Amino acid sequence: MRTEYCGQLRLSHVGQQVTLCGWVNRRRDLGSLIFIDMRDREGIVQVFFDPDRADALKLASELRNEFCIQVTGTVRARDAKNVNADMATGEIEVLASSLTIINRADSLPLDANHVNTEEARLKYRYLDLRRPEMAQRLKTRAKITSLVRRFMDDHGFLDIETPMLTKATPEGARDYLVPSRVHKGKFYALPQSPQLFKQLLMMSGFDRYYQIVKCFRDEDLRADRQPEFTQIDVETSFMTAPQVREVMEALVRHLWLEVKGVDLGDFPVMTFAEAERRYGSDKPDLRNPMELVDVADLLKSVEFAVFAGPANDPKGRVAALRVPGGAQLSRKQIDDYGNFVKIYGAKGLAYIKVNERAKGLDGINSPVAKFLTADIVDAILERTGAQDGDMIFFGADNKKVVADALGALRLKLGKDLSLTDEDKWAPLWVIDFPMFEDDGEGGLTAMHHPFTAPRDMTASELKTAPEEAVANAYDMVINGYEVGGGSVRIHNGEMQQTVFGILGINEQEQREKFGFLLDALKYGTPPHAGLAFGLDRLTMLLTGTDNIRDVIAFPKTTAAACLMTEAPSFANQAALTELGIQVVKKAENN
């Protein structure tokens, strides 16, 4: 039906007769001439109808936005004064000789000239996806997956599919369950990741595996989370953690070079402890120049319990955050930031305004100045590198609250005061995570998942001191987003059972949930390691949006619903009966 795409016409096509198919993006009726911007997935081209082709001109008078049409015409160069430098096709236009209206469009529920609500965009997603910026994002996503497949093929990885209907295993979030009609009362689980299957593939001898795969997690959603999402899933045998990182870093550098024309360079490597200490986050945004600086040793003797308490507590921390140019902040802004850190458990926000650095105590303005000596102020200013016009904010509490509160404040100030370099790419690897963390109920939970191997520990050493264990794990972070994470896996049955025991999984439960894995570990399991990237998150970064729904064709809302199809929906009673399911309604509160 077409010979060319609208958006691909150039001066090289001048004089050629072309047939185009697409939609009316805009129409301008000048009486004797009608101009339309005609759009397809590749872009927009100007088409015009003149009186010499009366039939086509007459039919063109009926055109409205989003009519689906076919046009045949001749490509012409525009006069110099009419060249549109803002359009890829702005040097040419098409003189139409014939027009076919394939399908008309009713009045549109989306307004092309105004910002539509996200609710409307999701309900009429098929119209929203016609917008050039949305089409471009999905084209970029397709390019990314194509680049990934070629790269992985070139590096000897095999694309192997793993099951969608599988067994529920604890991986940190709730499973989506699928009832079995054949096995009444039993349920499959949709995979949160192909974790165990890809490990089993390593045990099967396929030493380099990858898959671009759908995963499902029934969890509370955020702007960068979806109940169903896509992973670039990777596993290798006989490779160390640094070797895995080297290959995966090369993949991501390849993507940025091909999609953005940017060489990311070598990725720095930072330990979890250093990231938390300097940035208050295990996914630091290195575009932001501000860092947390420990000052507890300077404040142990002050007569100000807010500082002295945490400064003398082994589990406490006092840290300072220097904000370049922050002395300009108003009292209201400071109060607003004080309320902001309370969201993260902080009780408030002490500060020092640095007016004249050289004057020390006399050159600052601070509500806590009366508790500080000149020597202490000089030491704080020296350690933080403060300059005239800077602000220093303090966090004083337990270590987690200080990291969370000042880490979040650092990001907010970086954005609010334009301190974060939005034109920069800042990738890094974060390694050496704690293997376990407190579950809040006196037990331990795996920081990543229960199949991650510890670094340099035997099973007996791990059992004796699990809280000291460091995971042989690694996360890739770009501009403050965790885009991928992985680890070296446990390949020894004793170690795996030890980890299960630390997590409170007894032997009977181990057999019920992981018997197949424990059996497989008995038969010459190779050392293996892997990683998974979030394709949606990578695409989000590469297309410059901050909403993951913008890079998924048909996403869910933050309530895990599809507004277009109205999923989820109620099942009919006959289907439920056949599955042996009875729906129990919650009693209404009186």
UniProtKB/Swiss-Prot annotation:
Catalyzes the attachment of L-aspartate to tRNA(Asp) in a two-step reaction: L-aspartate is first activated by ATP to form Asp-AMP and then transferred to the acceptor end of tRNA(Asp). PROSITE patterns: AA_TRNA_LIGASE_II (PS50862). Its EC number is 6.1.1.12. InterPro entries: Aa-tRNA-synt_II, aa-tRNA-synth_II, aa-tRNA-synth_II/BPL/LPL, Asp-tRNA-ligase_1, Asp-tRNA-ligase_1_N, Asp/Asn-tRNA-synth_IIb, AspRS_core, GAD-like_sf. The keyword Cytoplasm applies. This is Aspartate--tRNA ligase. It catalyses: tRNA(Asp) + L-aspartate + ATP = L-aspartyl-tRNA(Asp) + AMP + diphosphate. It is found in: Cytoplasm. One of its GO terms (biological process) is aspartyl-tRNA aminoacylation. Homodimer. HAMAP family: Asp_tRNA_synth_type1. Belongs to the class-II aminoacyl-tRNA synthetase family. Type 1 subfamily. It holds the Pfam family tRNA_anti-codon. One of its GO terms (molecular function) is aspartate-tRNA ligase activity. L-aspartate binds at E171, R217, H448, R489. Residues 195-198 are annotated as: Aspartate. ATP binds at R217, D218, E219, Q226, E482, G534, L535, D536, R537. It comes from the Bacteria. It comes from Salmonella heidelberg (strain SL476). Keywords: Aminoacyl-tRNA synthetase, ATP-binding, Cytoplasm, Ligase, Nucleotide-binding, Protein biosynthesis.
